[in-house]
């Protein structure tokens, strides 16, 4: 793969993602001691708050930081507008905090946190799709990135609907569409992204050229 150093984002852009991610992981680890495991399956307020704080503040934050670095490697083109990543992490961080507090204390602020987080995700998706447009030749890995981000887009739409429903802004059967949100984001985006990226990254660590 012919990767130019000019495609690599500056360290000051990437660092906040990993700093926030590690801090969130530390906080959520300690918060686990306050969660009643016997009632975790019921998706009560504390469980939903912890899950979103962990998944958005740690998992997605780390993925976004990694994607800022890996997209040029996988697509073999520069970012369409890498500076957009400077506004993604503060929006995602604020949105995550509002959602966590909304689930735990005050459901009325859930839509606000959801919208702020949605804007962060939308900026990420927009930048990624515009970068993919620059690709001249598609392969399996690039296609997997495209498909994963399409799943993420629909997962976000469902997530906003769920936030509105949980806060009481609209009348929906929250638990009937909850699985769609989980499958679209965790299976559709996270798992496909990891599998697609692995086809590029594993040969690098194994010092081989490609899968046979």
Predicted feature locations:
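Hydrophobic alpha-helical transmembrane segments of multi-pass integral membrane proteins
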Residues: 1-212
